[in-house]
Amino acid sequence: MSQAQTWHAVKPARQTWLQRWSQIKPSSQAAGKPLQLYLLLDVAQNRDLLARVPESGAEALFAFKRDSKEGKVSPWLVHLGRSGQSLKKPQQDLLNAVLDVVQASPCATLLASECEMPALLAHLRRAMDPKMPEKDSSYLAFWDPTVLAALLGQSDLDTKSRLDPVLKPAQSRALLGPIARWWCWSRSGRLHEYAAADFSETAAPLPLQLSAAQVDALVQGNVPDLLIYYVNLNQPHLRDKLPPLAMHWFARQQLVFARRYGLTGTRDLLNY
């Protein structure tokens, strides 16, 4: 048997996050700047969490109002607190609620930055609107942890697999920008960290310029999750007995078989 832990044996997110955050120190100690902790919440994947978002210190990336139809499915940036201080109760309650579900539901990432909220929000808004080939238009949905993993790359010990990064190193550095560390949970429920210090290249300018090959890689990489989303939405009984990691690999396997029959459209793939 492999020595790697199974998906079920991974430590709870509350435990791993507490250990990791307690180890984080500001990068510019001489300047005395604390690291600010932020939550980037993908409300569309777990709408119940929006009710726990505090009234202050939270902004929708698309600037929608909280009670609007769009605001209820928009990604939200929430300031939780800073290093060296305990979180206030509303922020801690929100973080706990996220940590309780994030290993099974990829709905949030955590960010640490010396920037205050307005500066970080401005950076994320610039980064999410890349230049596309042939004047196409689309947002870079890095608030979805699975998209973030595709953009920056991710290794998974449990499946012994690796997602190669869609972005070039200079583009990855540009996406991180003022973000010192960016955390998400992998498909097998493990905490994964991206650190700005890991990218030595000079950052590319924003907005990012994506090539046709990069766009195609993002689209193809997102197909399994898109199909799972529609299955969960319309026919949840089909996946009741499969945990998220197993469901993802099942979908990827079936896509290989479906494409052998020449099936490519979303409806055809779902029916298959």
Report the location of each language-model feature.
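A contiguous, surface-oriented mixed alpha/beta subdomain in the mid-to-C-terminal portion of proteins
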Residues: 1-72, 77-78, 82-85, 92-93, ...
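Short, charged beta->alpha transition segments
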Residues: 90-98
